[in-house]
Curated annotation (Swiss-Prot):
Positions with biased composition (Basic and acidic residues): 275-285, 686-701, 733-742
Gene: ppp1r26
Disordered: annotated span: 228-382, 444-468, 504-526, 589-748
Protein purpose: May inhibit phosphatase activity of protein phosphatase 1 (PP1) complexes. May positively regulate cell proliferation.
Molecular function (Gene Ontology), one example: protein phosphatase inhibitor activity
Biased composition range(s): Pro residues: 451-460
Keywords (A to Z) from UniProt: Nucleus, Protein phosphatase inhibitor
Keyword Nucleus: yes
Secretion signal, residue range per the UniProt entry: none
Biased composition, class Polar residues, residue ranges: 359-368, 504-516, 705-715
High-level lineage: Eukaryota, Metazoa, Chordata, Craniata, Vertebrata
Name of this protein: Protein phosphatase 1 regulatory subunit 26
InterPro entries associated with the record: PPP1R26, PPP1R26_N
Length: 1105
């Protein structure tokens, strides 16, 4: 702004560039730049261009890294997805790779199921964002080229996706490098395990730092060939016994996943790998040396050995489903294959550590130096990460055998020391390809069978479309594993049988492999229980033993067999038996599928072919899965819900049969309905075991007597369970019910609660109808309009008043006298009632018809005793009495304004809000002079000793009492208004000594005033007695009668509040005698009240005049 008036030359015209990029600030003509400045500007521009590209990549990659961190925490064995996706982000951004490639610790795996299905997809979007569209296109083009080019090394990989990936990485790196002037040497490591692949990607400092000349690719190819030759020469030299079998199963699963994933994901991953290769090639071009190439074969062999746990004829066949279009380098592929075969035969592991290759090579430029630092750090981290990541391939968990992990750690130590030469980079590049070729065989070959309960059988090749292993290798693996398992278990299990079943039903294998350990064990226990209880041991045969440690295929197969066997002994299970048994066994299986389907999709080989190294691993995995299971109970997945539907349908089919068989048992349909409606995680967890026991016992009891019934069918036409299958059927049903109750509460307690609730609702509805009928009957009450006609004209203007729900317990016929009548009412009501809509009442005095015998429940009682109120005098209510009794709310009518009684919906809401308080409401309505009806609660509520502060007043009128039994109150006709209802007259808090009418209301929940529109409830003192003092009868001149007495005694508004503090008062009232109202006294009462009202009016008018 300050330069607006300055000449244009003075203003600095800066070129705005992306974040972090320092642009050359050229000051126009008036300023001269030195050559140094110009050269610096160009250099800084180049450097900043690289930095800006890195930052642009970082912006998206940081998001991916954060997401990956979350996914790593949330995902439980989904190492394949994590690694493949991590590689995407890691390749683009090497330094962020550190956080991205962290191995998921065991404690975080429980949550993995939640995101296993979605993690890879979500990360794909991040990786796509990290790679520009141009880069993707370049990658695709390069893939086409690479098919005939470098990818030949990759072609040996287990899956085309991995090989293509590396080729794409190189091409992508070149594409990036083309845009960047400063080449950066990158260190790449072979994907011995996908963990090593992660290492490689971690080390890639940035795609920008790679030079993009095609000569790099050629040089890389040449160096790879040279490396292969050197490797062949040094094979004999690098003979070291390979560590114990450490099948990097996950590596195979990753390629499979990659092939199954979208091409974008592959492209991004490939781009990352290409970048790594380009970095390697750059460094190689800088420093090619045969020495390092010689060293590198050792590293390659070591990595290969670590990956290919042991030389087994099973794993030897390297099946290349898709040579990843990189079939041009046949010589290299052949050399790699030969090397692998020889290595496997010899079981040799070269001593050279792969991390040597990993270390960055020194570059001439600063960018090379920085990238090398970054790489070295990444390499160190990646070394440890690779070690941990390689084993999780085996056991879904980063558990390495001590030897393997130790050797890898040793390898990881000298990471940055020896990687200074370009030959090492060449070795790393070659190791990439070689490791890829080695990977497919490893999952086939080795399965570490723990000495203790064997893990689920390895079936790494069954699920994915990109299977590298041939059928023979799979068969061999299955046979060997089954044989070992049979030896371990000591059970005579025929491996051939299982082999055939597994081979014949790859779908079952895939599904079962998707099951988590918890579900596997659960299904196993269920099956074993069912078989033991339902089938004779001879029928169970080896399947029971087999299921002691259920294997995915075996379990599925055995579950089908179980269903068949359960239905076989008796043809009764046709509709209910099989449908229930199969869902029962499949309940856990399908839940496992629904839960871990996507998860095992991601780490199919890791889960299927992986075997836990020890019982500790198994136990920890089970614990983690149990945690995840609880989480999944809260939100069941599709597979789980389908299984539930199936089970529930089966139960609904079979339940009527059981009920018809044994009518003693109540129908169990309501629990299922409740299970649909109610879902309490805590209750379900607590009730799982109880419901299992209960339902099992009930089902057994229900089905045992039904054994005598004809097994062919019942009157409903549905098959009835026979004795042979009744118990198993009931058992399975009980288990199904238990599973349902695990997700939703279906306890009998819930059913009882629902029934209670329905009963209460019915009671409430009946009470409402009764109250309405009362209102209709009371509408016939005669109106004594003549005696109160003048008064009505002067005092009783029509006032809108709230009609709350009439209390069902108080069916008391009353006469609504004019404002002269004062009633003190304590409506004790413990039931919950809904409020009726607001009504407008024209307040008119009404008389009670003779012969009306009201009925009331024991909760309602009327207060006895009175306090004398002198005319034109104000006696403040006694608030000092009964410190233990609840306090009062005193309201006052503003008699000077026409809006004295805005008793409308808002007021109803206020009453409703107040009605939420605990017990009762004490109400004193009306105003009189020395009236007989000015009442007070004394003995009825509390002991006399506590009422010392109450003024001793003579009873001028009848006492309203009630017996201990609290029977229906019988009120003599023409008695004053004594009705269980609320008659609010006022809208303001009445001050002490105010000349207007005061209305005390007892509520216990309010210690402060609550303004609800025009009503304010004031809690005087929660500890004060419910004694109601005298009402002031003085009113201002303009005060017309604003007292709203319900002209329709039919629907007096009821103000119900509930308070435990009235319990004592209620007990005191129960000690009182029955109400005895004298008819004559009531007549006098009404006449006196009317008289008093007139006198008060006249006196007020005279005073005003």
């Amino acid at each position: 702004m300050f330069l607006v008036n300055a000449p244009p030359l003075a203003s600095f015209q800066t070129k705005w560039a992306p974040f972090g990029q320092t642009t050359a600030c050229r000051i126009p003509v008036s300023f001269s730049e030195s050559e140094e400045d110009i050269s610096r500007a160009t250099i800084s521009t180049q450097v900043q261009g690289i930095i800006s590209t890195l930052q642009s990549d970082e912006s998206s990659l940081e998001v991916t890294v954060e997401h990956e961190g979350i996914m790593q925490k949330t995902r439980k064995g989904d190492f394949n997805i994590e690694r493949g996706l991590k590689t995407n982000a890691a390749v683009l951004k090497g330094h962020t790779r550190e956080s991205a490639t962290l191995v998921v610790p065991a404690e975080f795996r429980d949550n993995k199921d939640d995101h296993s299905e979605f993690g890879p997809l979500m990360l794909e979007s991040d990786s796509d964002d990290s790679v520009d569209r141009d880069i993707e296109e370049a990658i695709q083009e390069y893939l086409k080229k690479k098919d005939t080019g470098e990818a030949s090394n990759e072609g040996l990989n287990t899956t085309s996706s991995t090989s293509v990936e590396h080729g794409v990485l190189l091409n992508d790196a070149q594409n990036f490098a083309a845009a960047n002037t400063c080449p950066v040497s990158m260190v790449t490591t072979s994907d011995i395990c996908n963990s090593f692949r992660l290492k490689e990607q971690q080390r890639s400092s940035s795609p920008v730092s790679v030079s993009s000349d095609d000569s790099f690719e050629q040089s890389i190819k040449a160096e790879i060939e040279q490396f292969l030759n050197d490797k062949k020469q040094q094979k004999s030299k690098s003979k070291i016994s390979s560590p114990p079998k450490v099948p990097c199963i996950e590596t195979q699963s990753k390629p499979k996943l990659k092939t199954s994933k979208t091409s974008e994901k592959q492209n991004s991953k490939q781009a990352g790998s290409e970048l790594l290769r380009k970095h390697a090639s750059d460094s190689k071009l800088l420093r090619p040396s045969p020495e390092t190439t010689k060293i590198q074969p050792k590293a390659c062999v070591l990595k290969q050995n670590t990956k290919t746990s042991s030389p087994s004829p099973k794993s030897t066949p390297i099946v290349k489903e898709e040579p990843s279009d990189s079939s041009s380098d046949d010589g290299i592929e052949e050399a790699i294959q030969l090397y692998q075969l020889e290595k496997r035969r010899q079981g040799i592991t070269p001593t050279v550590t792969p991390e040597k290759v990993k270390s960055p090579t020194s570059a001439n430029s600063l960018t090379h130096f920085e990238s090398r630092k970054r790489k070295s750090l990444n390499n160190k981290l990646a070394a440890s990460q690779d070690i941990s990541n390689c084993q999780p391939l085996l056991s879904k968990r980063p558990v390495l055998s001590e030897e393997d992990s130790f050797s890898k750690r040793e390898i990881g130590a000298p990471t940055t020391c020896r990687a200074e030469t370009a030959a090492e980079l060449m070795c790393a590049e070659a190791i990439l390809d070689i490791s890829k070729t080695i990977l497919p065989s490893q999952p086939q070959s080795t399965y570490v069978i723990p000495t203790e309960p064997p893990p689920p059988p390895p079936e790494p090749q069954c699920d994915s479309d990109s299977l590298v292993d041939s059928d023979d290798s799979i068969e061999q693996e299955i046979r060997t594993f089954l044989a070992r398992k049979a030896q371990v278990e000591g059970a005579g299990i025929s491996p051939v049988k299982l082999e055939t079943t597994i081979e014949t039903s790859p779908e079952l294998g895939s599904q079962s492999s998707k099951l988590s350990l918890t579900h596997k064990r659960k299904a196993k226990a269920m099956q074993s229980d069912l078989m033991r209880k339902t089938l004779p041991l001879d029928k169970l045969g080896s399947n029971v033993e087999l299921n002691q440690y259920p294997q995915p295929d075996e379990r599925l197969q055995s579950s089908g067999k179980f269903a068949a066997k359960l239905s076989a002994p008796s043809e009764i299970h046709m509709g209910a038996g099989e449908s229930i048994v199969i869902p029962e066994v499949s309940t856990a299986l399908n839940r496992g599928r629904g839960r871990s389907h996507g998860l095992t999709r991601s780490y199919s080989s890791g889960d299927k072919s992986s075997s836990l190294d020890s019982d500790e691993d198994l136990d920890t995995a089970i614990k983690d899965l149990l945690k995840s299971k609880r989480k999944y109970k809260k939100r069941p997945k599709d597979g789980k819900s389908q299984c539930k539907k199936r089970v529930r349908f089966d139960e609904t089919i079979s339940k009527p049969v059981e009920i018809s068989e044994d009518s003693k048992q109540p129908p169990k349909d309501p629990p299922f309905i409740k299970s649909c409606l109610l879902n309490s995680s805590t209750a379900k967890e607590n009730s799982l075991e109880k419901s299992k026991k209960r339902r099992e016992e009930k089902a057994v009891e229900r089905n045992i007597p039904s054994c005598s019934s004809s097994p062919q069918g019942n009157k409903d036409g549905q098959p009835m369970p026979a004795c042979a299958s009744n118990e198993p059927n009931s058992k399975t049903r009980a288990l199904d019910d238990a599973h349902e109750s695990s997700s939703v509460d279906s306890d009998d307690g819930i059913e009882q609660e629902i029934r209670k609730f329905l009963a209460e609702r019915a009671k409430v509805s009946s009470a409402l109808t009764a109250a309405q009928n009362e209102a209709v009957s009371d509408s016939n009450i005669e109106k004594n309009t003549q005696t109160l006609k003048q008064e009505q004209a002067v005092l009783l203007n029509p006032v809108p008043e709230t009609a709350l729900q009439p209390e069902p317990c108080a069916n008391i016929s009353t006469a609504a006298t004019a404002q002269a009548s004062v009633v003190q009412l304590l409506a004790l009501h413990s039931g919950k009632q809904s409020l009726l809509p607001v009504r407008l009442f024209n307040t008119r005095p009404v008389e009670v018809r003779t012969g009306m015998s009201p009925q009331s429940t024991p909760n309602c009682f009327i207060i006895k005793k009175e306090c004398l109120v002198e005319q034109n005098s104000i006696i403040k209510p006694i608030e000092q009495c009964l410190p233990t009794a609840p306090g009062r709310v005193i309201t006052q009518a503003n008699l000077n304004s026409p809006q004295n009684f805005p008793v409308a919906g808002n007021f109803v809401a206020g009453l409703k809000y107040v009605s939420g308080t605990e017990k009762q409401l004490l109400l004193n309505v009306g105003h009189t002079g020395p009236s007989k009806l000015a009442t007070e609660i004394c003995k009825s509520m509390v002991h006399n000793s506590r009422l010392a502060n109450c003024p001793p007043l003579d009873r001028k009128g009848p006492a309203l009492e009630r017996s201990k039994e609290l029977p229906a109150i019988s009120i003599i006709p023409k008695s004053p208004l004594v009705r269980s209802g609320l008659y609010l007259l006022t809208t303001k808090v009445c001050k002490e000594n105010s000349p207007s009418l005061c209305l005390p209301i007892n509520t216990t929940a309010y210690k402060t005033g609550i303004n609800l529109m025009s009503i304010q409830y004031c809690q005087v003192n929660t500890q004060k007695p419910p004694c109601v003092g005298e009402l002031s009868v003085n009113q201002p001149k303009s005060a017309e009668s604003r007292v709203s007495v319900p002209g329709h005694a039919t629907n007096p508004p009821l103000f119900v509040t509930r308070s435990r503090e009235f319990k004592a008062a209620r007990e005191g009232v129960e000690r009182e005698g029955r109400t005895n109202l004298n008819k004559a006294a009531s007549h006098d009462l009404v006449a006196d009240s009317v008289k008093k009202v007139k006198e008060i009016k006249n006196s007020q008018e005279s005073k005003n005049v």
